[in-house]
Amino acid sequence: MMDFLKRFFGSSQERILKRFQKLVEEVNACDEKFSSLSDDELREKTPQLKRRYQEGESLDKLLPEAYGIVKNVCRRLAGTPVEVSGYHQQWDMVPYDVQILGGIAMHKGFITEMQTGEGKTLTAVMPLYLNALTGKPVHLVTVNDYLAQRDCEWVGSVLRWLGLTTGVLVSGIPPERRKAIYQCDVVYGTASEFGFDYLRDNSIATRKEEQVGRGFYFAIIDEVDSVLIDEARTPLIISGPGEKHNPVYFELKDKVAELVHFQREMCNHIAAEARKTLDPFLGMDVLPKDRKIMEGISEACRALWLVSKGMPLNRVLRRVREHPDLRAMVDKWDVFYHAEQNKEECLERLSSLYIVVDEHNNDFELTDKGMQQWIEKIGGAAEDFVMMDMGHEYALIEEDTTLSPEDKLNRKIAVSEKDTQRKARAHGLRQLLRAHLLMERDIDYIVRDDQIVIIDEHTGRPQAGRRFSEGLHQAIEAKEHVTIRKESQTFATVTLQNFFRLYEKLAGMTGTAITESREFKEIYNLYVLQVPTFKPCLRIDHNDAFYMTEREKYQAIVAEIISAHRSGKPILIGTESVEVSEKLSRILRQNRIHHTVLNAKNHAQEAEIIAGAGKVGAVTVATNMAGRGTDIKLDKEAVAAGGLYVIGTSRHQSRRIDRQLRGRCARLGDPGAAKFFLSFEDRLMRLFASPKLNTLIRHFRPPEGEAMSDPMFDRLIETAQKRVEGRNYTIRKHTLEYDDVMNKQRQTIYAFRNDVLHADDLFIVAREQIEHVSLALAFLILKDARADHCSLPKVEEWLSYSFPVKLDDQEIRRLGNVDAVADYIGGLLIEAFDAKFSSMLTEFTEIIGSASGAQGVCNDILRSVIISHIDEEWKVHLMDMDLLRSEVGLRSVGQKDPLIEFKNESFLLFEGLIRDIRIAIVKHLFALELSLTRSDRPDNAIPTVATAFHNHDNFRPMELTIIGEEEN
């Protein structure tokens, strides 16, 4: 029935395209109408449209004219020179109907899927122009600085011709220039540049003049799937050096390396013994039928199953897996030990290892044997694996009648410090093990100039300046014997998911989005629209070629490269890691094939390499070329030779990345072809392929070196990719659920902070904080609702120590209720505050000679005090939230939902944060002692406000310098 209705009415995509097509016709009509206008008359259309919008016309009503204007300008610019990235180019682009259609979709808030070479960059100009007419912030988000600069110079020339201003944000631009850039009508930049400016404005700026942004109205995200999906799990973090160096990584690095060495040696020994049994059968196509022989083979495969849990990449294990029958037998033991009835035997066998590595879930677990080895042979401490029960420890201290209250407090502090040290040591140990067991050099990171440089898993680019969080970076530094740097402390953080939710309107464009349409809809409320191509795609997509072993696969790839190279076709070979690209490069050198390698180690030559990749006979080996975001343009000889030939050395875990790699060829009607070569040893096949695959390869094993190619295998690959995509989607959604909790708190704190930055009278803000503290004290005093059992003595002692006020016990008891007591305490504190700052204001007025100037100085002082405590307490809160996030997962063992537990406890932490901020602010205001002095310079005095503090709590001396004018 649904199929019938779809055929009758058309799919939702078809209906939307049909509706938008009518607007395309209106745009073309406007374009023709504007052709008779002079350049000045056409430019005058921009202020006219702005006025019409201000007078109430909607952008939808203005769309046909605005898009028609852009198209007409593009036609007028044809043949004019445009300087792009230092090169002179001639403008030769006029939007096609499909580009206008894509531009309409983006204005309407769609993600437009447009194939590589279809002109997404020009398409974006139309919705950018239309939305910039509002005068509100309009941003174009790219995947790197180069594209931001290029697009601003290139298609930004259309916007500038029409009288709009454009700016580009790249790394290294100072704050004062950033502020000017944000004032432009349209701003180009990367997600990280926009995101970090948002964090700096809300966590680093101490005056409103230091804030650079002007809000979030409309954004178009180029390569939207890369930004909102691939990078969604990586938060933007502003951090600084921690207060102290954690020595645990240096202390434990050799011990952890020794434990991993024990594990490797044991697994190598087990594998070597198994190989003695299996060696005679590795060359056989069919295993013998003799029962006794098969029992021996089965036991050897059982031993290799154990090796797979200790060292999954063991060479013997990988060699045995090349034989389909032996591979099936190893996997059979895996299925056997996953069964509930065999759980005890599974645990017994795994207990013979030091560490159990779960390659599928990227995790590991130390066994009892591993712990024993750590303690007895390596010299580790038993305390490394035992956490303290703080409730029990505190109870023992309270029960000790020989201790005075002060001694009990000191004991509790000592126990708390001991617990913190144990947790830090245990955490460091786990991160060192993770670095050795799960993080691979030249895949996850490279070592350069005594530093660990992260490799972006999606683009293959080195991420200089970025560091793995939670001590993992220090652990890898220890593993690779480079300088171990201090752990960083987070000052501010936000995920890209929640950052882009700040925009009123959001749109995107990419060549591959339809496979992720569900995630775009559920998380961002964005719908994907597939835009037709301008010309039919001539790409030839060959079936995947499957090989039994990695060795056979590489032999076939080299043979294919040699064959295609003879025809003159330019060849692009896509690899998943630096390691694979360098391995393939060695093989090509051995075969004397001239080629160029583009990976994280030589990314600086990227533009030069890409420029030559489309020339006839070029061979380019590129790591994650899919994420490069740059088109490869063919010369005439390359087109005549058959166009770009794309070879994939493995399937990515995401179908979308594979589609991107295919899309690098056959752009805008050019010829081209793509083919993937796979082996059953590839990570995707090994970890996520269906068990049916083992059955198939056992029955259809081809001769050595011969490929298997069948749509059935393609479907199995797609199933494996869908399984991985589903898992990754769950992880991203899970991450977002936790960050949503943090996001609400972030918005509350940032709103409070901005109110302080923009407030004209900080005395009002200060009095509000005093009132809040007074209410909290009233609750504390009357928490039992009985004056006879209240906390009055403790509160009185604390108040007299912190503030210049003394409470009247009789008055407190007479008032009795919280509101009345709060008003009483607040009255005393506000009276003392007003007296203190009135005196200060009088003194400053005499020195400065201006009441308004003195008021400004006092406002600056109060603002500095309030902002400093918001920032300091927020940093501590971020650390507490990270700790809670890392610990709450264990609650599932007690049949509790970790997310619910996180929400409940984070709410309590946030309540405590607000209370601590207010108390710290109020205490600081009363602890402040100020003096104002003039500079000896007669022409331009600089009053210096030096603030000193009483010696209590952790207040640090601070100095403020206020620029002022000397009295004439």
From Swiss-Prot:
Monomer and homodimer. Part of the essential Sec protein translocation apparatus which comprises SecA, SecYEG and auxiliary proteins SecDF. Other proteins may also be involved. It catalyses: ATP + H2O + cellular proteinSide 1 = ADP + phosphate + cellular proteinSide 2. Its EC number is 7.4.2.8. Belongs to the SecA family. It comes from Chlamydia muridarum (strain MoPn / Nigg). GO terms for cellular component: cell envelope Sec protein transport complex; cytosol; plasma membrane. ATP binds at Q99, G117, E118, G119, K120, T121, D631. Coiled coil: none annotated. This is Protein translocase subunit SecA. It is found in: Cell inner membrane; Cytoplasm. The gene is secA. Its main location: membrane. Keywords: ATP-binding, Cell inner membrane, Cell membrane, Cytoplasm, Membrane, Nucleotide-binding, Protein transport, Translocase, Translocation, Transport. GO terms for biological process: intracellular protein transmembrane transport; protein import; protein targeting; protein transport by the Sec complex. The keyword Protein transport applies. Part of the Sec protein translocase complex. Interacts with the SecYEG preprotein conducting channel. Has a central role in coupling the hydrolysis of ATP to the transfer of proteins into and across the cell membrane, serving as an ATP-driven molecular motor driving the stepwise translocation of polypeptide chains across the membrane. It comes from the Bacteria. It is a peripheral membrane protein. One of its GO terms (molecular function) is protein-exporting ATPase activity.
